[in-house]
Regions:
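Short, structured patches in soluble enzyme cores that scaffold and shape functional sites
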Residues: 78, 87-91, 106, 128, ...
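Beta-rich nucleic-acid/ligand-interaction surfaces
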Residues: 119-138
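Short hinge/gating elements
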Residues: 42-48, 88-93, 162-163, 182-183
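Extended mid-to-C-terminal alpha-helical interaction segments
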Residues: 139-187
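A generic structural signal for well-ordered coil/turn residues at beta-strand boundaries
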Residues: 70, 81, 120, 142, ...
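Core beta-strand-centered patch of the WYL/Sm-like small regulatory domain
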Residues: 94-120
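N-terminal low-complexity or simple alpha-helical regulatory segments
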Residues: 1-86, 99, 131-133
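Short, well-ordered alpha-helical segments
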Residues: 55, 97-105, 171, 175
Length: 187
């Protein structure tokens, strides 16, 4: 952690995040106005696992998290050819963009897991200047286009993916949750 270019493995990151969850008793590890109780993500997953399509699952997930207030949200937008996931997080809660970047990775990883294949991103836009660690984004998002200082932060993919069926079920969800957040990190 003291070396700026050092990397940790997905397994080490998973252990670190789980330790933070236990210490803080907060799935958002202190980055939100109110703690997010442990198990919130699991309940959301139990809700969306019954959706028929990826689009339905992502919309349900978005609606679920809006129940907790307006501080954080992720909105799903769709037009004829493209779909976008747009996180909205107050800059005061996320000055280093850690939560924004984590949310993009988590939602992208969850969508990929639900359809049992990597959801190819067309673009990733960030509303902030290029950070020092931006070279790592290629390994995180695999998007051919990344733009900084964009009007808003969003990930964009082909809208057709929203019509794909959910390929997971309650049994695979149980294993997924035991290992979380590991599967959300590895593409």
């Amino acid at each position: 952690l003291r070396q700026p270019k050092a990397r940790i493995s997905p397994e080490q990151y998973t252990r670190f995040i789980k330790m933070l969850w236990m210490v803080t008793q907060d799935e958002h590890v202190g980055f939100d106005v109110q703690p997010r109780r442990l198990g919130t993500f699991a309940i959301m997953c139990q809700l969306i696992i019954h959706a028929k399509t990826l689009g339905q699952a992502l919309e349900l997930s978005s609606q679920f998290y809006k129940l907790f207030g307006d501080e954080w949200s992720v909105t799903l937008e769709r037009d004829k050819h493209e779909a976008r996931l747009v996180p909205l997080i107050p800059k005061t809660l996320d000055p280093d963009h850690f939560i924004t970047e984590s949310m993009l990775m988590i939602w992208h990883g969850l969508a990929s897991w639900l359809i049992e294949r990597r959801l190819p991103l067309e673009r990733v836009h960030f509303s902030y200047p290029r950070p020092a660690h931006a070279d790592e984004y290629d390994a995180l998002f695999f998007a051919p286009v990344m733009q900084f200082v964009a009007p808003r932060t969003e990930i964009t993919f082909a809208a057709d993916y929203l019509d794909l069926p959910i390929r997971q079920d309650e049994k695979t969800l149980e294993e997924f949750l035991k290992a979380a957040p590991a599967q959300l990190l590895v593409k």
